[in-house]
């Protein structure tokens, strides 16, 4: 039997053919619900995270006021618009684990607006009274945030275009759209909508607020003041491993579940979301579907610190050394027993002692869960994906733990091994002599420093925007990282790693 095309009329047949391994939406859609959320940036992570939480609220708790209207701002988003439109805005989330696979057809995205076709329609949608939340997954570059000055990159041509009052109905950037819609609500006497960042950034809500208020001040100080007083921008921590969809995933969905979906999402069973309870125009009852809704930024930051230092730090440990060792996927690295022991000991002995205690959170269990997630052979999470843009990761995920360990005279040699592996990775050649590509906005400067420094860390550490000044003067740190660099250069990752395992 050929696979069934994913659309509304085929849902019953898809469910019947699924033999208990498929879920489909049975809740009202289209005109029977209100689109209370407008989401900018409908990619894999959004469709595996926020859209799934909303799907569960609609399916299990009768929520009808918070369906999602997706928005695409870039030409790349046309493909997503076309595929979702052809499937009645339905898509499949494939959860994979060592225990098997499960397919969930998600219907929480109710419509999709492609901004290049009609920018005014997007502004009007966001300004509509039914819109309570505008959520974002626009990646770091979409925030026009200068990490050195912590200010809006106001000189960017697209920001300059959006600051021109003549272009208010045809904005280009997220902040141009947000401002135009909020200005319209201001003039209509409505409340502002909540702006909810779902990007994997520290203080994502605070950054969003500062960037939008900065934009608005340049445009209209009165509206900027209104946004400052009445607008809410909750901070959040998000987590779900979501690799890019491959052609093989589309084929497997058709073969294993009988569903023809042109752009499914593949992910793991685990997902997490901690969000500050800071909304100005209502919100869904997120607590009912497992979201941790907390009272303030400090509570978010405690969860975030666990994730950044343990999950993201471990990803860094797996990625750069794993690529040097010739591995392709995350789970392959974890199949090496020495590597698995290294990861566990780094988390338990060097990172865990630095973390705050959170009521109800068992750090040991969290670490075990991470090892299980990383070991999942069905996700096929590629190392190049987690190695992307390391200049924004190592200074966040590894170096702060080293600095804190030095401060409390704790151990940090394994963390130094991770940093040394990244320094070596910058040469773009693995331990067998095979070249690989590196994607990093600072690549030219980093590679020049790596080449000039040789087997000494001083040149790379001289980049103050990444490393500051403190570590460069610590003799213990310099000795540990230099030793690791020299051992990796001489013996390679796999022969060096046993020296870092007890």
From Swiss-Prot:
Quaternary structure and partners: Monomer.
Record carries keyword NAD: yes
Enzyme Commission (EC) number: 1.1.1.67
Family from the record: Belongs to the mannitol dehydrogenase family.
GO function term, MF aspect, one: mannitol dehydrogenase activity
Domain of life: Eukaryota
Function as written in the Swiss-Prot or TrEMBL entry: Catalyzes the NAD(H)-dependent interconversion of D-fructose and D-mannitol in the mannitol metabolic pathway.
Lineage of producing organism: Eukaryota, Fungi, Dikarya, Ascomycota, Pezizomycotina
Catalytic activity field: D-mannitol + NAD(+) = D-fructose + NADH + H(+)
Protein name listed in UniProt: Mannitol 2-dehydrogenase
Keywords assigned by UniProt, alphabetized: NAD, Oxidoreductase
Positions of NAD(+) binding: 37-48
Transmembrane segments: none
